[in-house]
Structures are given as structure tokens and as C-alpha cells.
């Protein structure tokens, strides 16, 4: 199920962003997280899994050709694996902590 968010007045299905990233043969998996200030979404961050030496700037340029500008994430972070919580779901809070520690 896709998560619907609103950013700068645009409604965005986060799953659509993830799908475009995983359409790239270099990307094994992707998850996009909305970064909030209070209750307002201020930017999007996409975390990707890839075992390739992938150029993040090139990837962002490629994504910009298939997604509207307002759906292109501000930042892309490559990880070896996603953190999971005790319910075996991707731990989105931990992803935000990873992002903030960069």
C-alpha cells in the first residue's frame, strides 16, 4: 500500500517514487521517507539498496527525467541494507536517524 503525503501543495504517492528507482537495474530496493518539521513535510529522502558502485548524481538526473520535479527526492542515500524493527518492517525512524547522522 502506498503512502500518500502532501509536499508544497502536491499530493504524492511515495510508492510511485520507489517504483521508479527500482526500475533502474542498478537499484535492488528503494524506500522514500518524508522528512517533517512538526506536521509539515519539508522534503523527501530516498534510501536505496544497490550492490553496484552507483553514482547518486547520475541516478538523480535519471529520476528527474521520469518523475515530476516535485516528486524528485532532495537526497538519495545508498545503504547496504534497510534497518528492520521487531515487526519485520522497515524501520522508518531508524532511516531518519541514519539520514540525520550523515
Question: How would you describe each model-predicted region?
Answer:
Residues 1-102:
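AMP-dependent adenylate-forming
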